[in-house]
């Protein structure tokens, strides 16, 4: 009965969304396809993230996953899927956040929030390490994404762009904007931030907490600006700043992987001493 009621409520909401005008039945069908496709995409990405986290417990990657050409191609394809889902939803572009009104304002606001968030997460990382003797991000994950050279840092900065675009299109544009006719905006922000945090499972428990907080901030920024541009900029700046800070804490570029691993061990020396 509960499932039947849920589907009945979905049907009523879809009818409200597509009320009036010719082709109403077709619009209803396409919105249902949009909802199903978006949920399927979320489940797919969730499953692959969970599988990656399990794999990392048994097998150590020898290269930076952000620089994988195969992964980059998949991300670009998924970005196309997100755009396609938004296009068939029947919703106006403002609802999806696909607007560029006051673009400079959004760029500046997103950059400022991203800078503040990145610094805040860095402070949280230091507090977690000093007070609890653990790390905000798992050691394995940190060692994988840390640039080995200055040149690699620039490649990672470029590789982050499609990562951020994909995550913001899915979690803010589709799951908040696209589902806003079905559920209250505040509830969507909470739900998406929790899922967004869970998808950062490879980063460890505290990494999930940090990502959930960031997801909530990006969601609120999306609602405030009615655009996905500002949260995209904030997301990118925050991620890049965190990588930059870790890179500099490791005494700058390293020509080999063992050098970077030595740097990570040096960062952990204080917390290990505290445990002893």
Labelled PLM ranges:
Residues 165-170, 174-175, 202, 237, ...:
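Active-site His/Glu-centered metal-binding helix of metallohydrolases
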Residues 189-198, 204-263:
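Functionally important transmembrane alpha-helices
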């Amino acid at each position: 009965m509960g499932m039947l009621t849920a589907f009945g409520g979905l049907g009523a909401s879809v009818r409200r969304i597509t009320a009036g005008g010719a082709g109403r039945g077709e619009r209803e069908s396409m919105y249902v396809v949009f909802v199903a496709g978006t949920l399927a995409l979320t489940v797919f990405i969730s499953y692959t993230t969970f599988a990656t986290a399990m794999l990392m417990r048994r097998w150590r990657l020898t290269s930076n996953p952000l620089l994988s050409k195969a992964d980059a191609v998949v991300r670009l394809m998924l970005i196309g899927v997100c755009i396609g889902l938004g296009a068939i939803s029947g919703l106006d572009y403002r609802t999806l956040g696909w607007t560029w009104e006051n673009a400079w304002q959004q760029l500046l606001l997103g950059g400022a929030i991203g800078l503040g968030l990145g610094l805040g997460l860095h402070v949280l990382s230091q507090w977690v390490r000093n007070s609890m003797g653990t790390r905000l991000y798992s050691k394995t994950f940190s060692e994988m994404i840390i640039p080995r050279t200055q040149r690699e840092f620039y490649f990672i900065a470029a590789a982050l762009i499609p990562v951020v675009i994909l995550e913001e299109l899915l979690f803010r544009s589709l799951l908040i904007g696209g589902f806003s006719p079905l559920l209250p905006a505040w509830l969507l922000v909470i739900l998406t931030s929790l899922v967004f945090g869970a998808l950062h499972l490879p980063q460890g428990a505290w990494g999930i907490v940090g990502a959930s907080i960031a997801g909530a901030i990006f969601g609120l920024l999306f609602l405030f600006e009615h655009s996905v541009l500002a949260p995209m900029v904030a997301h990118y700046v925050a991620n890049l700043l965190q990588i930059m800070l870790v890179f500099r804490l490791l005494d700058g570029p390293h020509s080999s992987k063992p050098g970077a691993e030595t740097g990570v061990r040096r960062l952990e020396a204080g917390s290990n001493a505290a445990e002893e």
